[in-house]
Amino acid sequence: METLTVNLAERSYPIYVGAGLLTSSALFAPHIAGQRVMIVTNDTVAPLYLDVLRKTLAGYQIDTLILPDGEAHKTLASFEVIMSALLKGTHGRDTTLIALGGGVIGDLVGFAAACYQRGVPFIQVPTTLLSQVDSSVGGKTAVNHPLGKNMIGAFYQPKAVIIDIDCLRTLPSRELAAGMAEVIKYGIIWDADFFSWLEQHISDIQSLSPDALSKIILRCCAIKADVVAQDETENGVRALLNLGHTFGHAIEAEQGYGKWLHGEAVAAGTVQAAETSLRLGLLSDTDVSRIKALLKAANLPVTAPADMTYDDYIHHMLRDKKAKAGKLRLVLPQAIGRADLFTDVEQTVLRAVIDATH
């Protein structure tokens, strides 16, 4: 097992990465506030891992809540289901919530923990690659709204993130690929050597090599922990973690949440960001080709939905949380390993990019 730390003064917390961690009661115990625990999971993960975790936490008074799986259920309605379960169970501030699942469950449970009685502790137990390398770390919690993704939420840090790489053995190949979009993102924005390593070892990741999985999870979490420690509430460098997300969130919202997995939309959005950089003279043809090739090798889309127009994108992108004073701001790569935030890219450039990437 390896341990990383997100350094946020008195709110600092560990990230544990290893195999078989779901069965380690000693790992959970220091991060559980009292005797009561509510495990929230979904109907895909529950048959696989809920009983395992219940057995691990056998010494506690455990309630469980099983929600429907999928991005379509990351809603205020699901949030209210969690609230109702907590209230009906007369849970207090000494209850610890545990998010057992992927990014949707983690975001939902984190938001519920932030709001219930103005804040109760929670633990992230991510079971998908995307949640293990990205969404479980950093305290972003939210639900979607029909008019925009992650528009209702809070910054609220977990007490711990417990990453069991064995959970990836039951992950469908499409979900594994979706998680790779976030892994590749870290190479593009932060670490050129890591990007090169991914080019050489993508097949090891796809064959679920424990060493390769540990490597990518630890590297991504280390980068994110560093960024979050510098900029917890996304006023500066943390915005770089949104490479591909402004285009990608527009795809998700326009297509209907769940039609495109988050990672698939981010992959297409990353290509659109790279093409924007190319047209602005920020990025070389060679780097754009390498980005596309690695995304393709990871079984991710490199073209966006054919039925989306420029107006469809802008309708959603102007609601993006990075926008300021009505002006669009985009994270754009300047080289593999380096990116920055750019304001007010010309509409003619965006139109050309959107036309070229469908």
From Swiss-Prot:
Binding site for Zn(2+): E182, H245, H262
One MF term in the entry's GO annotations: nucleotide binding
The protein's Enzyme Commission number: 4.2.3.4
Keywords: Amino-acid biosynthesis, Aromatic amino acid biosynthesis, Cobalt, Cytoplasm, Lyase, Metal-binding, NAD, Nucleotide-binding, Zinc
Group of enzyme by EC: lyase
Domain of life: Bacteria
CDD domains: DHQS
Subcellular location: Cytoplasm
Any Gene Ontology CC annotation: cytoplasm
Annotated cofactor note: Binds 1 divalent metal cation per subunit. Can use either Co(2+) or Zn(2+).
GO biological process terms on file: amino acid biosynthetic process; aromatic amino acid family biosynthetic process; chorismate biosynthetic process
Disulfide links within the chain: none
Cofactor(s) this protein cannot do without: Co(2+); Zn(2+); NAD(+)
Family designation: Belongs to the sugar phosphate cyclases superfamily. Dehydroquinate synthase family.
Record-linked HAMAP family: DHQ_synthase
General function of this protein: Catalyzes the conversion of 3-deoxy-D-arabino-heptulosonate 7-phosphate (DAHP) to dehydroquinate (DHQ).
Protein name stated in the entry: 3-dehydroquinate synthase
Organism: Tolumonas auensis (strain DSM 9187 / NBRC 110442 / TA 4)
